[in-house]
């Protein structure tokens, strides 16, 4: 059926184990979301692939976890109270000059390794979410992407 009128099944997902994980940033993109109040906000999403493995799927394939880190797009990256400011500062990224475009931001974060501390939080609906409590810089090469993750811009270009 092209457009179903049946409620969609909730897709089960595996929670990332809590604790420390070696990771690498594999994507950065923006999304427009509508809040509970009907307000439209732009979010900047950082996607980290970690060294932790998911349980094997039905085909026996075992992939690495990916964690999506959703951030409000601030009026100024220099706003010290903003979560994105705190995340980038903790990660050791120089943002003193700002970023003129998403592409400039991507150059600073893509393929950059990090040591993440993952914690679980429970939403209002009882769903357990993975959250990044800390994102620390890594000396040396660090964890490298496996190549299994497809960037959003590549998915969006050909969604079907």
Go through the PLM ranges and name each one.
Residues 1-160:
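Short beta-rich binding modules
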């Amino acid at each position: 059926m092209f457009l179903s009128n049946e409620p969609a099944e909730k897709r089960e997902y595996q929670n990332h184990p809590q604790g420390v994980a070696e990771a690498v940033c594999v994507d950065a993109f923006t999304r427009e979301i509508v809040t509970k109040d009907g307000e439209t906000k732009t979010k900047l999403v950082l996607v980290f692939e970690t060294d932790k493995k998911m349980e094997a799927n039905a085909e026996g394939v075992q992939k690495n976890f990916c964690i999506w880190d959703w951030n409000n797009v601030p009026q100024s990256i220099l706003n010290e109270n903003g979560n994105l400011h705190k995340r980038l500062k903790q990660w050791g990224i120089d943002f003193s000059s700002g970023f003129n475009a998403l592409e400039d931001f991507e150059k600073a974060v893509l393929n950059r390794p990090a040591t993440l501390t993952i914690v679980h939080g429970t939403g209002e609906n009882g769903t357990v979410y993975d959250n990044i409590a800390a994102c620390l810089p890594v000396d040396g090469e660090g964890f490298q992407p496996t190549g299994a993750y497809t960037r959003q811009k590549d998915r969006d270009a050909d969604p079907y």
